[in-house]
Swiss-Prot record:
Description of how the protein assembles with itself and partners: Subunit of the RFC complex, an heteropentameric complex consisting of a large subunit RFC1 and four small subunits RFC2, RFC3, RFC4 and RFC5; the RFC complex interacts with PCNA. Forms an heterotetrameric complex with RFC3, RFC4 and RFC5; this complex has ATPase activity but is not stimulated by PCNA. The heterotetramer of subunits RFC2, RFC3, RFC4 and RFC5 interacts with RAD17. RFC2 also interacts with PRKAR1A; the complex may be involved in cell survival. Interacts with DDX11.
One of the protein's GO biological processes: DNA repair
GO molecular function, one term: DNA binding
Residue(s) carrying N6-acetyllysine: K161, K302
Species the sequence originates in: Bos taurus
Lineage, highest ranks first: Eukaryota, Metazoa, Chordata, Craniata, Vertebrata
Amino acid composition bias (Low complexity), ranges on this chain: 18-30
Identification of the protein by name: Replication factor C subunit 2
Family, similarity comment: Belongs to the activator 1 small subunits family.
Length: 352
């Protein structure tokens, strides 16, 4: 895949001036370097990583040319906006710049935007290939106010002959039912570790980045299925240290180290509450939030080698504690109580 502008046809500067991968320490470069997230953003639908079934439906839309209004829902960093831009590029070709309006609904979320910007664009005359429509892209559409969404549904009907709407959102249930019923809803899931690894290796090869296997594992661990996060972490670590290993990655990402968390779980499996608590107290005094600690405990526990029945019991207790923390009971005592319950699960029941 070539290094190209990902600005998606909105005429961003620096479209083709992405510099080749730096062979020296990156901080010394005297020119502007595009973020790798933008530099390696796919420009065609077949370059998108993951969610093959959903992307294949978009390819059918691009081939047939008859696109419905669409909603793409899914977690951050899975390629929702990129997919819409690739679809628009495939449909409109050279007319992309004039025939696409891209709005981020997090900023442009009020009813005035629907009444002014969107309506004005929908009314504009644009010369397009036969059977093609103008496209209005609403990113993070679940941030739009209810009033704006109500106004949007009427606009979608009035201009249905000339304009198609493409909405990207994290939670489709925050889009009102009348809009959902006017759209084809496509769902994206988090990317697998192997999918992220394949793209990381591709970028590493192009940028001539030195790395270790444990460094890539650390990037994948911190990304949690988010390709944007993975590429940002890769570039940040390379910019800061010039070498990708797990120590450098966790210095940049700064979250509870999974090796420490793994050791803590091992002490719980051995019913050694004192040693487990020492590690917990250490993480706490390093300033990590309870949400960060409990999140990493869960992620490490999922892949930890232990009896299946015990893993299920551990995950149940971790989930229960996570719920309490989310409700605001996030003290060190709450976390210590979790360790005590985990240790208790591993101890043989005492005959009465």
């Amino acid at each position: 895949m070539e290094a190209q502008d990902s600005g998606g046809g909105t005429g961003e500067c620096g479209a083709q001036d992405a510099a080749p991968g730096p062979s020296k320490a990156p901080g010394s470069a005297g020119h502007y370097e595009l973020p790798w997230v933008e530099k390696y953003r796919p420009v065609k639908l077949n370059e998108i990583v993951g969610n093959e079934d959903t992307v294949s439906r978009l390819e059918v839309f691009a081939r047939e040319g008859n696109v419905p209004n669409i909603i793409i829902a899914g977690p951050p960093g899975t390629g929702k906006t990129t997919s819409i831009l690739c679809l628009a590029r495939a449909l409109l070709g050279p007319a992309l710049k004039d025939a696409v309006l891209e709005l981020n609904a997090s900023n442009d979320r009020g009813i005035d935007v629907v009444r002014n910007k969107i309506k004005m664009f929908a009314q504009q005359k644009v010369t397009l290939p036969k059977g093609r429509h103008k496209i209005i892209i609403l990113d993070e559409a679940d941030s739009m106010t209810d009033g704006a969404q109500q106004a949007l549904r009427r606009t979608m009907e009035i201009y249905s002959k000339t304009t198609r709407f493409a909405l990207a959102c994290n939670a489709s249930d925050k889009i009102i039912e009348p809009i959902q019923s006017r759209c084809a809803v496509l769902r994206y899931t988090k990317l697998t570790d192997m999918q992220i690894l394949a793209r990381l290796l591709s970028v590493i090869e192009k940028e001539k980045v030195q790395y270790t296997d444990d460094g890539l594992e650390a990037i994948i661990f911190t990304a949690q299925g988010d390709m944007r996060q993975a590429l940002n972490n890769l570039q940040s670590t390379y910019s800061g240290f010039g070498f990708i290993n797990s120590e450098n990655v966790f210095k940049v990402c700064d979250e509870p180290h999974p090796l420490l968390v793994k050791e803590m779980i091992q002490h719980c499996v051995s019913a050694d509450i004192d040693e487990a608590y020492k590690i917990l107290a250490h993480l706490w005094h390093l300033g990590y939030s309870p949400e960060d600690i409990i999140g990493n405990i869960f992620r490490v526990c999922k892949t930890f080698q232990m009896a299946e029945y015990l893993k299920l019991e551990f995950i149940k207790e971790i989930g229960y504690t996570h719920m309490k923390i989310a409700e605001g009971v996030n003290s060190l005592l709450q976390m210590a109580g979790l360790l005590a319950r985990l240790c208790q699960k591993t101890m043989a029941p005492v005959a009465s």
